[in-house]
UniProtKB/Swiss-Prot annotation:
Cell location: Cell inner membrane
Domain ABC transporter: 5-241, 252-495
KW Cell inner membrane (keyword) present: yes
Main subcellular location of this protein, as a coarse class: membrane
Gene Ontology molecular function terms on file: ABC-type D-ribose transporter activity; ABC-type monosaccharide transporter activity; ATP binding; ATP hydrolysis activity; D-ribose transmembrane transporter activity
Protein name, entry field: Ribose import ATP-binding protein RbsA
A Pfam family that the UniProt record links to this protein: ABC_tran
Taxonomic lineage from the root: Bacteria, Pseudomonadati, Pseudomonadota, Gammaproteobacteria, Enterobacterales
Binding site for ATP: 37-44
Keyword line: ATP-binding, Cell inner membrane, Cell membrane, Membrane, Nucleotide-binding, Repeat, Sugar transport, Translocase, Transport
Length: 501
């Protein structure tokens, strides 16, 4: 079968680092090509070379059989290549229709925008994705998941021959993911080619026909998905076997450290639970169940309307994140790029940002040598892959950014560490490293709350699990009681709470 798109022998270097070396990718009509590899393997760089954001140093690009060079995203888009970015590329103050057709508005014979046609066409695209809202709604009023669906609708509007999807389901619910898969199958039937970049093995084996593996900027293999198992694919990605994906540390927790009684706040209703020293408490539930809201109320990022929180036997009131930090509660956000990191600042500045009081003299000046030593220690401990601590954090891979975000929390010497989706957008190798770090924190007596949408992660890492449903606690289970079926039943509100001390 002749490929719609072919990249061969692609090289791309930046000062001090070779990002791609002999990389290759084929996209076939009517087939979905998965592109996989650890963070930093070169997937994003390859997409930027393909769409003309970066100029390749060597190699050829064949588009519809002809050697081509795209001068930028506009030229690749006009040629028929659409891309759905992992980072949202929308303007919150504009409506959905205005975002979808920005720069391509429908105009009438008088040269004025034909709003009626524009909204009607946008509504058709939303209906294709099974979305329940109209296109006259402001994008800023939508959830992150709904905004991602608008991003997908925008790319569909170009009727591209090849569509690149970069982690398209990261912020989607199961229902939204199924709607996306339905659209992908429809696009396949029309002879379109899809590049599907994802860390989610389940999705790759469900929706993809072929898979291309990158490792350290190099092309490793192209295979039919049906010829592989999850284990063999992971081994190709990381170059080694990953024994025991969720390395649970079997160590009995200590005394109660955190006690939450009848906590209420935005999206949180009458929630009570405890957390012990050296314990990992998993928090499960569907999107919109109130898990993140509960953590933000606890930390002080959302207002508490009633209820009590005691830490080491003393009542604490957190009216702001500063109160949370001052009391030893650290929250690592699920959206590290929006809430967790300052992308234009360096690794060092990001890591020490909330712990500057430990490096300050009486007059307010910084003890730079102490700061650098602490950052250097954490970079080594966390195995952060960066050319130097002065590197802008926005240039690091997702897994390394997440390690810096966690390190920053630990620099404040917390008693309770809240990790909200700590491995979202992180490759399998970096996930394993993060799990090992979590176990290390547990061994040191830190109390950890692990919020995750990945049930195997919650089941594999937690000592005890609580489940949220519509702002309430719908279940509490020991490690032995918990199964995927039990957690899902509690997540949809079909199971009465089980509480075993």
């Amino acid at each position: 079968m002749e490929a719609l798109l072919q990249l061969k022998g692609i090289d791309k270097a930046f000062p001090g680092v070779k990002a791609l070396s002999g990389a290759a990718l084929n996209v076939y009509p009517g087939r979905v090509m998965a592109l996989v590899g650890e963070n930093g393997a070169g997937k994003s760089t390859m997409m930027k070379v393909l769409t003309g954001i970066y100029t390749r140093d060597a190699g050829t690009l064949l588009w519809l059989g002809k050697e081509t060079t795209f001068t930028g995203p506009k030229s690749s888009q006009e040629a028929g290549i659409g891309i759905i970015h992992q980072e949202l590329n929308l303007i919150p103050q504009l409506t959905i229709a205005e975002n979808i057709f920005l720069g391509r508005e429908f105009v009438n014979r008088f040269g004025k925008i034909d709003w009626k046609t524009m909204y009607a066409e946008a509504d058709k695209l939303l209906a294709k994705l099974n979305l329940r809202f109209k296109s006259d709604k402001l994008v800023g009023d939508l959830s992150i998941g709904d905004q991602q669906m608008v991003e997908i609708a925008k790319v569909l509007s170009f009727e591209s021959k090849v569509i690149i999807m970069d982690e398209p389901t990261d912020a989607l619910t199961d229902t939204e993911t199924e709607s996306l898969f339905r659209v992908i199958r429809e696009l396949k039937s029309q002879g379109r080619g899809i590049v599907y970049i994802s860390h989610r093995m389940k999705e790759i084996f469900e929706i993809c026909d072929d898979v291309t593996v990158f490792r350290d900027g190099q092309f490793i293999a192209e295979r039919e998905v049906a010829s592989l198992t999850e284990d063999s694919l992971i081994e190709m990605m990381v170059g080694r076997k990953l024994e025991d994906q969720y390395p649970h540390l079997d160590k009995a927790p200590g005394d109660i450290r955190l006690k939450v009684d009848n906590l209420c706040g935005p999206g949180v209703n009458d929630v009570s639970f405890t957390l012990r020293k050296g314990e990992i408490l998993g928090v499960s539930g569907l999107m919109g169940a109130g898990r993140t809201e509960l953590m933000k109320v606890l930390y002080g990022a959302l207002p508490r309307t009633s209820g009590y929180v005691t830490l080491d036997g003393h009542e604490v009131v957190t009216r702001s994140p500063q109160d949370g930090l001052a009391n030893g509660i650290v929250y690592i956000s699920e959206d590290r790029k929006r809430d967790g990191l300052v992308l234009g600042m360096s690794v060092k500045e990001n890591m020490s940002l909330t712990a500057l009081r430990y490096f300050s003299r009486a007059g307010g000046s910084l003890k730079h040598a102490d700061e650098q030593q602490a950052v250097s220690d954490f970079i080594r401990l966390f195995n952060v892959k960066t050319p130097s601590m002065e590197q802008a954090i926005g240039l690091l891979s997702g897994g390394n950014q997440q390690k810096v975000a966690i390190a920053r929390g630990l620099m404040t010497r917390p008693k309770v560490l809240i990790l909200d989706e700590p491995t979202r957008g992180v490759d399998v190798g970096a996930k394993k490293e993060i799990y090992q770090l979590i176990n290390q924190f547990k061994a040191d007596g830190l109390s950890i709350i692990l919020v995750s949408s990945e049930m195997p992660e919650v089941l594999g890492m937690s000592d005890r699990i609580i489940v949220m449903h519509e702002g309430h606690l719908s279940g509490e289970f020991t490690r032995e009681q918990a199964t995927q079926e039990v957690l899902m039943a509690a997540a949809v509100g079909k199971l009465n709470r089980v509480n075993q001390e």
